Amino acid sequence: MSKRDTSQPKTGQPKTSKRRNGLTYAEAGVDIDAGNLMVEKIKPLVRATRRPGADGEIGGFGGLFDLKAAGFTDPVLVAANDGVGTKLKIAIDAGKHDTIGIDLVAMCVNDIVVQGAEPLFFLDYFATGKLDPDQGAAIVGGIAEGCRQAGCALIGGETAEMPGMYHGNDYDLAGFAVGAAERGQLLPTDDIVEGDVLLGLASSGLHSNGFSLVRRIVAASGLAWSDPAPFNDEATLAEALLEPTRIYVKSILKAIRNTHGIKALAHITGGGFPENIPRVLPKDFSAELDLEAIDVPPVFSWLAKTGGVAPEEMMRTFNCGVGMILAVASGQAAQVAAVLQEAGETVTPIGRIVPRRDAGVIYRGSIGL
């Protein structure tokens, strides 16, 4: 992992310079010692993400990755970057920072695996107005956990302490992931046909989209983040809403390699079904979804009823219980589903590919909100 630069504001003076009887960098709001302490705290977390191709230590100016050592012969690189959106605000307000990093990794690596690529390494950007080493270590701990779940190495990061740029305890995160696939093995394939089956993989909850609407609904409900969740007897409202985004990488890669039946994958993020599924389909085909086959988790029903959100708006904003959709050859759907279930996924047939009509997604039945 490359060395984290923990003091970002640039001045005409070296970072550690001090004029006689003058101000110091710490007095200006940037604590280099706090940054160094955070680096020490995260070193073991970073080491735990090592994998073939990445075994560097913290301290370099850049992270290294050896594609040959990772087993690739003629790879095509696939890159993705993303953030967590205003889900961060709930983590900040609730003081719960240990899982938001999982979301950051998930949003990037799930976008890589849908192209048939294996995520290889990850870098993060963490910006705050006042660095708290323990908080920072908790955040990076979540990032490291996400990397372990995805099988990718955390090889670099940036911690930016920027006084005056963020209010109070606010911070922001951005993630960058790079993966690879052998040339000729990228998805979607060019043989999608009418009758191909659509399989849905269950989400873990809201994942990381729609949280500006979520926060608006919670504010109108009068509930506090520490109150029991109305839709979950075992968690506070904050804990339930902060359930980390599911990382589908290992199960999907296993299904791709063991069945060769997956033709396309759609990560259901912002825009929901109508915006994400058509992105991976040829222009002469549509996805026909059987909405009554979808098992909608209680959190979505609560949001819809409490906020008075119409079903169409729910499906355009949230995943509604389906975090990933696969287009699979009809004759191999059972085999693909079996491999995914063995890998821990909840798999449901939710539709099929049909000739293109007016819309890229056609709904049948009603969703159970």
Swiss-Prot record:
GO terms for cellular component: cytosol. Its EC number is 6.3.3.1. Transmembrane segments: none annotated. It comes from Mesorhizobium japonicum (strain LMG 29417 / CECT 9101 / MAFF 303099) (Mesorhizobium loti (strain MAFF 303099)). Disulfide bonds: none annotated. It is found in: Cytoplasm. Keywords: ATP-binding, Cytoplasm, Ligase, Nucleotide-binding, Purine biosynthesis. It catalyses: 2-formamido-N(1)-(5-O-phospho-beta-D-ribosyl)acetamidine + ATP = 5-amino-1-(5-phospho-beta-D-ribosyl)imidazole + ADP + phosphate + H(+). Belongs to the AIR synthase family. Residues 1-22 are annotated as: Disordered. It comes from the Bacteria. The keyword Nucleotide-binding applies. This is Phosphoribosylformylglycinamidine cyclo-ligase. Pathway: Purine metabolism; IMP biosynthesis via de novo pathway; 5-amino-1-(5-phospho-D-ribosyl)imidazole from N(2)-formyl-N(1)-(5-phospho-D-ribosyl)glycinamide: step 2/2.
